């Protein structure tokens, strides 16, 4: 772990989040979020960063991925029960903004066959891109299930106009170790994106959806 957040602090915060949750059982699986507050950063002038990092354990088990596939990929997706759409189904949306928006809302992320990816903007318009869900490419050499898992366990840091951001790093059914490892990966990656690394970090918290925030830094 980087020297700025000690192992003990991290484990203590994780235990607080997980045990706080055990006291109040919710009817849904609470996500654990890493909340970051930045300083010495001017979103207007400084370069807005964005980057993705793959975590060891999938932070959101219910995260849904849809394959926009050629015939072979659609057949594969069907065989393993992964949601999919072929090019004909996409053409039927007829670039209708409402329908494309609905599609973007329905799934958390998309994969598209390499052969189709360049055609997506032409067939669907800019809707998926606007929603921040432009598909990742899927080749025929890749194992589809593994690729979907990779998408599910990848998180994105994106600096917008404000000096705080939040990302899902896990959920409350994880073990302490799984959650600590995910947070460790996420924090170190985030700090590496910042212009002045730790000097740009004002505070770090973790919290479950309904729980109290626990300060890490």
Swiss-Prot record:
It holds the Pfam family Ribosomal_L1. Keywords: Acetylation, Cytoplasm, Isopeptide bond, Phosphoprotein, Ribonucleoprotein, Ribosomal protein, Ubl conjugation. It comes from the Eukaryota. GO terms for biological process: translation. The modification Phosphotyrosine is found at residue 11. The modification N-acetylserine is found at residue 2. It is found in: Cytoplasm. There is a cross-link at residue 118 (Glycyl lysine isopeptide (Lys-Gly) (interchain with G-Cter in SUMO2)). Gene3D superfamilies: 3.30.190.20, 3.40.50.790. Belongs to the universal ribosomal protein uL1 family. This is Large ribosomal subunit protein uL1.
């Amino acid at each position: 772990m980087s020297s700025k957040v000690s192992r003990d602090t991290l484990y203590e915060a994780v235990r607080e989040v997980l045990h706080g949750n055990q006291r109040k059982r919710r009817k849904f699986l609470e996500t654990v979020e890493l909340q970051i507050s930045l300083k010495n950063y001017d979103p207007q002038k400084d370069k807005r960063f964005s980057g993705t990092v793959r975590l060891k354990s999938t932070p959101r088990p219910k995260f849904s991925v849809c394959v926009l596939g050629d015939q072979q990929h659609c057949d594969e997706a069907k065989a393993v029960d992964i949601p999919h759409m072929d090019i004909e189904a996409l053409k039927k949306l007829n670039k209708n903004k409402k329908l494309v928006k609905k599609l973007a809302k329905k799934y958390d992320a998309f994969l598209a066959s390499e052969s189709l990816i360049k055609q997506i903007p032409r067939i669907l318009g800019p809707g998926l891109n606007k929603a921040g869900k432009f598909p990742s490419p899927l080749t025929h050499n890749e194992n589809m299930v593994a690729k979907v898992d990779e998408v599910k366990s990848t998180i994105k840091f994106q600096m917008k106009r404000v000096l705080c951001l939040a990302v899902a790093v896990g959920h409350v059914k994880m073990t302490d170790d799984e959650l600590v490892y995910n947070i460790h990966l996420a924090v170190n990656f985030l700090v590496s994106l910042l212009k002045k690394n730790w000097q740009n970090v004002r505070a770090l918290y973790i919290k479950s959806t309904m729980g109290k925030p626990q300060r890490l830094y």
